[in-house]
UniProtKB/Swiss-Prot annotation:
GO terms for biological process: arabinogalactan protein metabolic process; mucilage biosynthetic process involved in seed coat development; negative regulation of leaf senescence; protein O-linked glycosylation via hydroxyproline. Belongs to the glycosyltransferase 31 family. One of its GO terms (molecular function) is hydroxyproline O-galactosyltransferase activity. GO terms for cellular component: Golgi apparatus; Golgi membrane. This is Hydroxyproline O-galactosyltransferase GALT6. It is found in: Golgi apparatus membrane. Its cofactor is Mn(2+). It is a single-pass type II membrane protein. CDD domains: GLECT. Possesses hydroxyproline O-galactosyltransferase activity. Transfers galactose from UDP-galactose to hydroxyproline residues in the arabinogalactan proteins (AGPs). Is specific for AGPs containing non-contiguous peptidyl hydroxyproline residues. Utilizes UDP-galactose solely as sugar donor. The addition of galactose onto the peptidyl hydroxyproline residues in AGP core proteins represents the first committed step in arabinogalactan polysaccharide addition. AGP glycans play essential roles in both vegetative and reproductive plant growth.
Amino acid sequence: MRKPKLSKLERLEKFDIFVSLSKQRSVQILMAVGLLYMLLITFEIPFVFKTGLSSLSQDPLTRPEKHNSQRELQERRAPTRPLKSLLYQESQSESPAQGLRRRTRILSSLRFDPETFNPSSKDGSVELHKSAKVAWEVGRKIWEELESGKTLKALEKEKKKKIEEHGTNSCSLSVSLTGSDLLKRGNIMELPCGLTLGSHITVVGKPRAAHSEKDPKISMLKEGDEAVKVSQFKLELQGLKAVEGEEPPRILHLNPRLKGDWSGKPVIEQNTCYRMQWGSAQRCEGWRSRDDEETVDGQVKCEKWARDDSITSKEEESSKAASWWLSRLIGRSKKVTVEWPFPFTVDKLFVLTLSAGLEGYHVSVDGKHVTSFPYRTGFTLEDATGLTINGDIDVHSVFAGSLPTSHPSFSPQRHLELSSNWQAPSLPDEQVDMFIGILSAGNHFAERMAVRRSWMQHKLVKSSKVVARFFVALHSRKEVNVELKKEAEFFGDIVIVPYMDSYDLVVLKTVAICEYGAHQLAAKFIMKCDDDTFVQVDAVLSEAKKTPTDRSLYIGNINYYHKPLRQGKWSVTYEEWPEEDYPPYANGPGYILSNDISRFIVKEFEKHKLRMFKMEDVSVGMWVEQFNNGTKPVDYIHSLRFCQFGCIENYLTAHYQSPRQMICLWDKLVLTGKPQCCNMR
């Protein structure tokens, strides 16, 4: 039976009902999607905060966190350089739990006993053995208290008491001192929270007359002269809170030399210094910087001043000629120039202002710009916590303004980034190609972090074909030891040698490195370096592999026929070293031993037959010579590419590198594939 046809009105009514139902259904779907979105947001935000932000460093001086995947990093940088050669390639089959069969022991396995440090009068090391015995006994006690939790409880009690008595330290917006106040403080003005962009320091002073020096540091005595007249002073921004017990880094060294410079003319010299290693000096000698030379915030590095000689450069001669012709043609010079004298004069008051710009420091004297010095890698404004003024100068007053009013922390451990990205991989079951033992001090938190973030990211280290560990003794400060233990437990790359640390006993860490590399890992090669040494891992391993496997080897920057210094800071007494010459020895910042030599060193130590000397690198040379003479011939391989002082192009190791320079060296190596130095101004 055929259905009756619907009228137009009925059809419209049905269509309206359909549209209404469709709208309701759309609203319901939209509400469901919105509810689902809210649920996702609710669960996702805590996850992001928990996993993402927790891995970010709170240290404003550190670089951004590395990408989670090295593969992602490679994709981002692929146009510049494929990173297969340096960075570890992640495998999809790998899981976080894989390879956890062996974990690094925090405490060294090197065996100490009461007989270990019995002094021997035969080799002149009586005093060294005595101090080693005391250091071991004290260190053992410190470690026991650290393990039991006594140290942590004592520290919490001390901290609470300190806050009750003194409150928390605050940062001042400005600091001012009179000349007499500065003198009372040992010519040091503390800058509580360092400097920041826009900070400025004003010094009002008067240079003194020249005095005679028989041993001048800035010039050489002429033949027949007994002394030279010198007048100079130094303003230095120093990192007073960098590492306790060490020379503070000189973040800026400003040295006006009125008289006595080797050039015979007044100059202003500027530089930086880290661990007694000076950079390349910037000297202003009265000539204006060239037009094609880089500027600092638009200012030239050196302004011109009147010189008392008639020597002029070719550029100046041509400039004068052009000005003369311009004057003849137009009738007047293009611009009026004033030639100022050298900004400092004996017994004449001056006002010097040092300001921190975007690209560097700017120095003006009596309102006139004199010189600008660009910031250097590894030296930052925040770390400049002290101003020192020394030399031939009478200071009337010092004022520092626009200082930062807050700083996150000056504790050394602020540099630690507790991220799993930097944790050491587990020890492999198979033999490793090379073990690298890194000498470090307890409070060198920044140095260790820089090593983790730089050359320890090499694919050979991440894949455990090369294993690297820090070797640290116990510190005199309780809080350092507490933080050190936490660091060791988290990163898994620290081996603590249980004795109280001192420079003369560094040799014990070296023996511990040999024990770990030869016994714990059975590594083919054992390398020793310092925590301010950058290691080009693949090149160093290739250098070691050049020697046939059945040969004993000793590789490094080897010194021959060196004699002991009998005077000065590094002096050695005849009781300590009676011989006239040292044995051939490789410089301490980086050298390699074969496994058999390392085993010999440990064996002699455990039998209490190992002769020890306070200079660690000389000690190793002495042990290698003993092995060479009595056990098996050794191949001595000398290479200047194990750089002792600073960095050279095509280095194998670079020494005296600050934490930021370490990161810079790694970035250059990753991006270019070539060992290039940083800070080569």
